[in-house]
């Protein structure tokens, strides 16, 4: 039974509700179909047309799979200016046609990019086609392998590179780049024909982290030419010229700061720990640390600092300072024909060095060191 009072209450409540303002519902614009496709699309490219197709379609794919791609001669596998968040996956064997040119064979750039190698995948440079014993100093023009330029907050991992014609990774203009579990195998060039096959050349970059690298080559395992906040750890360097700062000088940016090499092995190489600066130039090297570094079968110098790297016939100059240079637990062996430690500094350019638990033996003791900092033995 409905009483008259109940009817009155219900009528009043309905009137109040109808009189109250009601907020418009929030309307979220529907994403465009093309944007959804870009976010979700996985594209696979293969064969002799794979490189060209990938370069043309790269901004339409959130994941780019490169499966047994055969890059034509004189052509870069161009993966520059990728969409943010793109994932690149190498599968199978990636090959490159022969031509005398400067390269690069591969180039990647962008923000929040991930580059990975699938199990068993490798990039085969087949460098013997170019090797002539002269590297980048003459003979055939040889392509550099992999440009990691202008990468931000990105990761390259699990990449296996075999027989690069000349320098392998060029890292330039990048920041917050992590490289993990990279293998560079240029052992086929150990017969003397391969040269200047640097593993990682770093310039004008910040916050670069390289972990777990295995580098078998014929030049610097790592060469930091300029940049700040660079960290290399858990690496194995074999057959090359060691873990190097420089050469510093001769560029628009000649500053190296806050570099750490940690928990790594250098074996069967010309040099172990190395800093090289250019005669007569200006710049600075500071806050460089080598910690827990093991040397074995070093042929030339266990530890070497040269401030006349480009012309050893001249006296070292002090335009490029080397300050706060730390060695902590650097130990190992040099061959009897080599030299344990060799330091050639400018008159006032090498300061605030701290060496602890340094034991490099087996080679000769140099009598030609110059301007060795206080408390450091040459």
Swiss-Prot record:
Family according to the record: Belongs to the glycosyl hydrolase 28 family.
Alphabetized GO MF terms: polygalacturonase activity
UniProt entry tagged with the keyword Repeat: yes
Disulfide linkage: 43-61, 221-237, 345-350, 369-378
Residues with attached carbohydrate: 258
Stretch forming the signal peptide: 1-19
Function noted in UniProt: Involved in maceration and soft-rotting of plant tissue. Hydrolyzes the 1,4-alpha glycosidic bonds of de-esterified pectate in the smooth region of the plant cell wall.
Principal localisation: secreted
Catalytic-site annotation from UniProt: 219, 241
UniProt superkingdom: Eukaryota
Keywords assigned by UniProt, alphabetized: Cell wall biogenesis/degradation, Disulfide bond, Glycoprotein, Glycosidase, Hydrolase, Repeat, Secreted, Signal, Zymogen
GO biological process: cell wall organization; pectin catabolic process
Name of the protein in its database record: Probable endopolygalacturonase E
Record's GO cellular component terms: extracellular region
Cell location: Secreted
PbH1 repeat extents: 103-125, 174-204, 205-226, 256-277, 285-307, 317-345
A Pfam family reported for this protein in Swiss-Prot or TrEMBL: Glyco_hydro_28
Gene (name only): pgaE
Family annotation (SUPFAM superfamilies): Pectin lyase-like
SMART domains reported in the protein's UniProt record: PbH1
Catalytic reaction(s) noted: (1,4-alpha-D-galacturonosyl)n+m + H2O = (1,4-alpha-D-galacturonosyl)n + (1,4-alpha-D-galacturonosyl)m
Propeptide: 20-38
The keyword Cell wall biogenesis/degradation belongs to this UniProt entry's keyword annotation: yes
EC number: 3.2.1.15
Enzyme class (EC, first level): hydrolase
